[in-house]
């Protein structure tokens, strides 16, 4: 009976994974199709579509913009997230639990809700639809990611390390930079990698706040509206490989915690 139950569970898990990830394998496979129309079976394999991508100016520009937004928003979220997570961990004050729930709102609310809200609110502040608006939008939800990742590490940190450093005469600022930060560096690296991936893949907020310049996901969306070609498959394959590598690295650093 146990063997049958184990087989059913294993088969069900395998079926779910196939349903989720088999389409990705199909995309990777068809990205090497030499023909412009996807057909099965593939008669001729080629790297032509990857080469063509390297000459696609709009795609290259979209990649540059995506990296620009991802890096700046991650840095901003890191600068705000580390001290915020430290304050949430170290100090107890009225409304702390409520504040933590509010901080988590950007990652719990649907992206379309956040995008519409920012689209309505930013003009009141005199912020036009632009890369600046996209940068602020990405930073908003990345702060929540950064705080949750680093706060989890703070909770596992030995409190006696900080106490010992203080007893030896170290100032609070020196304790933070010489004792606290080195002990949470793996969590910081993992949070940074995860934030970069999420920013690079973000669509709803970007869609509502972008102007004429496109990020990579928006550019891919525009290409798909004209039909799925092997060039789209090639872009999707590269994005998948880069995202997977970053996520695995993030998990590796988080596992070390």
Question: Which ranges hold each PLM region?
Answer:
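Transmembrane-helix boundary motif in ABC transporter permease subunits
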Residues: 1-6, 71-103, 116, 120, ...
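Interhelical loop and adjacent transmembrane-helix boundary motif
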Residues: 2-5, 35, 50-58, 200-254
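Transmembrane alpha-helices
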Residues: 11, 17-24, 115, 147-150, ...
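A structural signal for multi-pass alpha-helical bundles of membrane permease subunits
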Residues: 22-35, 65, 115-126, 193-198, ...
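Periplasmic/extracellular loop-to-transmembrane helix junction in inner-membrane transport proteins
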Residues: 36-73, 225-226
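Membrane-interfacial helix termini and adjacent extracytoplasmic/periplasmic loops
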Residues: 38, 42, 47, 96, ...
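Hydrophobic alpha-helical transmembrane segments of multipass integral membrane proteins
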Residues: 60, 64, 68-80, 84, ...
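Short hydrophobic faces within alpha-helices
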Residues: 63, 88, 105, 160-168, ...
């Amino acid at each position: 009976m146990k063997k049958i139950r184990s087989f059913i569970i294993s088969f069900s898990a395998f079926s779910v994974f196939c349903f989720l990830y088999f389409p990705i394998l199909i995309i990777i496979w068809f990205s090497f199709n030499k023909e412009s129309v996807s057909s099965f079976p593939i008669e001729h394999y080629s790297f032509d579509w990857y080469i063509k991508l390297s000459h696609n100016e709009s795609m290259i520009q979209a990649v540059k913009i995506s990296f620009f937004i991802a890096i700046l928003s991650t840095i901003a979220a890191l600068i705000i997230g580390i001290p915020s997570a430290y304050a949430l961990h170290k100090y107890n004050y009225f409304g702390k639990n409520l504040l933590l729930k509010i901080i988590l709102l950007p990652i719990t609310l649907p992206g379309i809700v956040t995008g519409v809200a920012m689209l309505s609110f930013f003009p009141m502040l005199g912020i036009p639809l632009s890369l600046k608006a996209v940068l602020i939008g990405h930073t908003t939800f990345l702060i929540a990611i950064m705080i949750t990742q680093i706060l989890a590490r703070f909770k596992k940190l030995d409190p006696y390390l900080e106490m010992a450093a203080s007893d030896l005469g170290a100032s609070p600022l020196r304790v933070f930079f010489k004792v606290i930060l080195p002990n949470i560096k793996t969590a910081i690296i993992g949070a940074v990698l995860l934030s970069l991936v999420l920013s690079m893949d973000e669509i709803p907020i970007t869609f509502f706040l972008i102007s004429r310049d496109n990020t990579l996901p928006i550019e891919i969306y525009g290409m798909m509206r004209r039909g799925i070609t092997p060039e789209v498959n090639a872009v999707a394959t590269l994005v998948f490989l880069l995202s997977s590598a970053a996520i695995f690295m993030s998990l590796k650093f988080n596992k070390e915690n």
